[in-house]
Curated annotation (Swiss-Prot):
UniProt PTM: One or more lysine residues are methylated.
One biological process term in Gene Ontology: translation
Keyword Magnesium set for record: no
Protein name: Large ribosomal subunit protein uL11
UniProt similarity note: Belongs to the universal ribosomal protein uL11 family.
Organism: Arthrobacter sp. (strain FB24)
Length: 143
């Protein structure tokens, strides 16, 4: 087995799927670690092409020889909730002004999508996490 490469940095970004370009915020974040920005952009765009339209969080591990690896996560729960509810943004005052409603089935669908990134052991637990996020955005969960 090849010797382990020394990690010099871990960068976490949220980028539109298939739309990474060297402009800020990507360029400066990668540039200060000496990563080839265009190489990352091409690899990220190829990996996320199927999910166009979503914001995809990515964790980039930078090694001392300036090479990198990256792991894409599932879209943020808030983004999935807004898309399912059909709203542009959550409520400014979530506990007094409600902006939309979600059914329990929609919450379960989002929970199953997010399951691998959530700190939950069961789908019910994941659904409770998603429902809590929705409530804090001023979106009512029915059922």
């Amino acid at each position: 087995m090849a010797p382990k490469k020394k990690v010099t940095g871990l960068i976490k970004l949220q980028i539109q799927a298939g739309a990474a370009n060297p402009a800020p915020p990507i360029g400066p974040a990668l540039g200060q670690h000496g990563v080839n920005i265009m190489e990352f952009c091409k690899a990220y765009n190829a990996a996320t092409e199927a999910q166009r339209g979503n914001v995809i969080p990515v964790e980039i591990t930078v090694y001392e020889d300036r090479s990198f690896t990256f792991i894409t996560k599932t879209p943020p729960a808030a983004e999935l909730i807004k898309k399912a509810a059909g709203v542009a943004k959550g409520s400014a005052t979530p506990h007094t002004v409600k902006v939309a409603k979600l059914t329990q089935a929609q919450v379960n669908e989002i929970a199953s999508t997010k399951m691998e990134d959530l700190n939950a052991t069961s789908l019910e637990g994941a659904a409770k996490i998603i429902a809590g996020t929705a409530r804090s955005m001023g979106i009512t969960v029915e059922g």
